[in-house]
Amino acid sequence: MIKKVKIKKFNGRDFYDMEDYVAVEESYNIFINGEFVKSLSMSPNFLNEFAVGFAISEGFLNKIDKVEVDKNNINIFGEKNDREIKNNKNNKEIKIDIEIIKKIISYEIKAKYWEITGSFHWASMFDLKGNSIIFVEDIGRHNAVDKVIGYAILNNYNLNKLILRYSGRIPSDIVKKAINSGLNIIISKSPPTDKAIELAEENNILLIGFARNGKFNIYTSGRLWEE
């Protein structure tokens, strides 16, 4: 995940030699049912979870049969999807209390690799009672989201009843990942884009941004929000 490198540091007046930690970046070739899809750079952890989360959240597959990781090649086998965004109508039955939102936001995130290098994003999953399920760091925010989605799927969680909290801004492609995987609630310390808000509104996704220091903004609520 990280490694030491030798650097020259300038302190505003002098240079001096020292060692510092940097993030490890690996490039992986992604295949769906043997067909090359794309190459991605990511941290070399939770690769099986990434494979499952990526294939589902990007709409390539709706059922995973097998994942093979061979060095820098990741091959995902399963049933194909038509890649259309699924309308997440079932989320109308999901309610969440403001106290649970407060609990999740107040949960202390220990992003050790980010603290050491400043080079990582993180993503986490919580249940509707505000309990933490999984936490992952990665050099890419989309990768981190895919990894926690994949973890939830592999461990038989119902994603309709999970909450995604992560560190990056919320663009529309993150909302698409939520829709394709069945997530209904996204919380981030950063804001969403206008397209993300529109897409979340259309699909009844509860979108919360600027979740920091006990404060947050609600951008879309739909039928999810319970006063």
UniProtKB/Swiss-Prot annotation:
Subcellular location: Cytoplasm
Pfam family, one: FdhD-NarQ
Cellular compartments per GO CC: cytoplasm
Keyword field contains Transport: no
Binding site for Mo-bis(molybdopterin guanine dinucleotide): F210, A211, R212, N213, G214, K215
InterPro entries listed in its UniProt record: Cytidine_deaminase-like, FdhD
Function statement: Required for formate dehydrogenase (FDH) activity.
Protein's name in the database: Protein FdhD
Organism: Methanocaldococcus jannaschii (strain ATCC 43067 / DSM 2661 / JAL-1 / JCM 10045 / NBRC 100440)
